[in-house]
């Protein structure tokens, strides 16, 4: 990594797994990750770090829960970005999309805490190396 440019289209074409992010670059203490997403993730929270999303293709919804329990959703389409603030419980869902994320290296894709059992299609990981 860091030895040359990474073509995101080619990187996305190199794997099919959903909710299983690949690390395409590292900068400072952050990973740049890409993922295919479809279906529901799990409600989870990252207590100490924000989470940045960029939709590369498709639609990506992020349900969030405020401190008083009120739920609200951010709907993102191709080219949209969104930052989930640290400490906010959230659950991504998608009918099918490709996304890019900036996350503090070592951040688990299922957060510091999550609710319920993990669905089989959700990979609890700090990211996999590309290729």
Predicted feature locations:
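Histidine-centered metal-chelating micro-motifs
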Residues: 42, 61, 80-91, 107
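Structural motif
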Residues: 31, 40, 59-61, 98
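Short, conserved beta-strand element in jelly-roll/cupin
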Residues: 36-37, 47-66
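A short glycine-rich, His/Asp/Glu-containing loop-to-beta-strand
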Residues: 8-43, 49
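A cytosolic small-molecule/anion-sensing beta-strand core signal
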Residues: 28, 56-57, 77-78
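Double-stranded beta-helix
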Residues: 2-12, 95-131
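Short acidic-glycine-tyrosine-enriched beta hairpin
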Residues: 66-86
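His/acidic/aromatic-lined binding-pocket segments of jelly-roll/cupin-type domains
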Residues: 43-45, 50-55, 73-74, 90-91
């Amino acid at each position: 990594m860091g030895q040359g440019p990474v073509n995101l289209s080619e990187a996305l074409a190199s794997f099919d797994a959903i909710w299983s992010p690949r690390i395409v670059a590292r900068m400072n203490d952050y990973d740049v990750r890409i993922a295919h997403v479809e279906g529901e993730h799990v409600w989870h929270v990252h207590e100490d770090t924000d989470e940045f999303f960029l939709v590369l293709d498709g639609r990506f919804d992020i349900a969030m829960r405020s401190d008083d329990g009120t739920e609200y959703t951010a709907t993102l389409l191709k080219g949209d970005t969104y930052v989930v603030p640290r400490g906010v419980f959230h659950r991504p869902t998608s009918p099918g999309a490709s996304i890019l994320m900036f996350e503090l290296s070592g951040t688990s894709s299922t957060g510091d805490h999550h609710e319920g059992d993990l669905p089989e299609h959700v990979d609890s990981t700090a990211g996999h190396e590309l290729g």
